[in-house]
Design a protein with these regions (language model features):
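Active-site-proximal cap/lid insertion segments
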Residues: 36-40, 47-63, 70, 79, ...
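Short, surface-exposed beta-strand/loop micro-motifs that present aromatic residues
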Residues: 144, 225, 408-420
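C-terminal segment of N-terminal export signals and the immediately downstream linker at the start
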Residues: 25-44
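Anion (oxyanion) recognition and catalysis
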Residues: 72, 148
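N-terminal secretory signal peptides and thylakoid transit peptides that target proteins
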Residues: 2-19
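Residue-level detector of anion-binding/catalytic polar loops
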Residues: 77, 153, 418
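His/Cys-centered metal/cofactor-coordination and adjacent catalytic loops
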Residues: 104-143, 201
């Protein structure tokens, strides 16, 4: 049965309404405050390559995630939440800027080394350009710097991934405390990326904890930071490396997990099952670490005045469970872009709710700015909006479109229409009836396809013209 075709007028009205609604919502400033006026603390937790169904609360039946399930029960779970890129670096850049990768300049990975360790990357991975080997444009204003207006102290514990030269490190971008690694991946125990040390404390490389599991280290440092700053507003950003595969020389690369967690699952009967168990164990170890962070907030009596945000940086890879979505990390299908997400904010967001509204990670930056009572940087265009009213069930999402580009791969969602044109497949899909993107409607709906392509061309031009300052060159 074919899907009715919207008229051109209706289609353009949708796009126009989207722009107006986004513009209006960016100016909304409604944030509940604790008695005494102290702005809320902020805890942002990001997992790495976690599958859409790698959580009990998202329908997963195999992985134990009691603490994340509890977080969802205490807040709202987002079922229709997207990131801006199907892999690491640009997704993280958008979180910290509230802007499309194409607008903030971080539209590809920062490798920081030639990946020639016997692993056959595609030819484009070897291209050496300043944009790929340096870091995020230093003219971009990141979330922690904006929050300083309200007296926040900010720390990051885990994966940075926005440049390893000193001028790109977290302390130069507004953070006050950093313990973690700077590249896209790491060995969970040696803290090396393909044999090269990658861990930093603040501005200096360190091997002080070599041999200790990274999830435990990032938990430890985040706990320390929250303890030390319990009497002032803080942003604690914890981007775990779990359950990303380890960046080691051996092949196939494993997902490393403590033996006790591996043994807590049924013994695998094959190599494939063993790899899946490693993945599950790494997720459960991370879940336990998150449980410790949430427990400390309760112990310090900060939980009622702390916003907690959790999501995965992109779709799952390896043995992750992305069902019922098509595709995986690196792809423009839903399995690469739609991710698990939950938000807890007592007093602002009802507990135990589910939000099916169309939202993205670019909404987090303006939401947190509004919650803190600070204005975004003057003259900076945000591509997101404060989603608090949406999460509270008080308003529908003003977002009507989202567009993606990863090198030659392109995709766009307008309302419930999703267009994909990529090396892994292409098509036009109606997500209202086909979340698995199994039925290509491009031949049945050629007018819709052409209109979305035309909108994508307009967006591409908008992004090219958005920054009159010119491309970033820091060399």
């Amino acid at each position: 049965m074919s899907t009715p075709t919207p008229s051109r007028r209706d289609f353009l009205r949708t796009l126009g309404a989207s722009a107006v609604a986004l513009s209006a919502s960016r100016g909304a400033m409604a944030s509940p405050r604790r008695p005494g006026g102290r702005p809320p603390n902020i805890l942002v937790i990001v997992s790495d390559d976690q599958g859409y169904r790698d959580l009990g609360c998202c329908g997963g039946q195999t992985i134990r995630t009691p603490h994340l399930d509890g977080l969802a029960g205490d807040g709202v779970r987002l079922t229709n939440f997207y990131v801006t890129w199907p892999a690491c670096t640009p997704s993280r850049g958008s979180l910290l800027t509230g802007r499309y990768p194409q607008r903030n300049g971080t539209y590809d990975m920062y490798r920081n080394e030639k990946p020639d360790y016997g692993y056959k990357y595609p030819p484009e991975e070897y291209a050496v350009t300043p944009e790929r080997i340096l870091g995020m444009d230093t003219r971009e204003v990141l979330l922690p710097r904006v929050l300083k207006q309200a007296g926040y102290r900010s720390g990051i514990f885990g994966k940075w991934d926005l440049g390893q030269l000193r001028r790109f490190l977290p302390l130069q971008r507004g953070f006050d405390d950093f313990y973690g690694y700077v590249n896209t991946g790491i060995d969970y125990y040696t803290h090396e990326r393909y044999g090269v040390p990658s861990m930093y404390r603040n501005n200096e490389p360190t091997t002080e904890d070599k041999g200790t599991y990274t999830t435990d280290l990032f938990q430890r440092e985040a706990l320390r930071f929250m303890q030390e700053n319990r009497d002032r507003p803080f942003l604690c950003y914890v981007p775990f490396n779990a359950p990303h595969i380890a960046s080691v020389l051996e092949r196939p690369r494993p997902v490393q997990a403590p033996e006790a967690y591996i043994e807590s699952y049924p013994k695998p009967k094959s190599k494939d099952e063993a790899r899946r168990v490693e993945h599950m164990a790494a997720v459960t170890a991370m879940d336990d670490a998150i449980g410790e962070l949430l427990a400390l907030l309760e112990e310090l009596e900060l939980a009622d005045n702390t916003i907690v945000v959790f999501f995965s940086d992109n779709g799952g890879s390896g043995t992750a469970d992305n069902a019922p979505l098509r595709g995986r990390k690196g792809q423009m299908f839903e399995g690469g872009l739609r991710v698990p997400c939950m938000v807890r904010w007592p007093g602002a967001i009802p507990a135990g709710t589910v939000c099916d509204e169309f939202l993205t990670s670019m909404e987090i930056f303006p939401m947190l700015c509004n919650a803190a009572g600070v204005a975004p940087p003057d003259g900076v265009v945000l591509d997101g909006f404060d989603m608090t009213p949406v999460l509270a069930g008080k308003a529908p999402s003003p977002r009507k479109e989202m567009l993606w580009q990863r090198r030659g791969d392109r995709a766009a969602r307008v309302e419930n229409w999703k267009w994909v044109e990529s090396a892994k497949g292409s098509g036009l899909f109606d997500l209202s009836t086909d979340i698995g993107e199994a039925h290509d409607l491009s031949k049945e709906q050629p007018e819709v396809l052409e209109r979305i392509k035309a909108r994508f061309a307009e967006w591409t031009q908008e992004m090219a013209e958005a920054e009159p300052r010119g491309p970033f060159r820091d060399y």
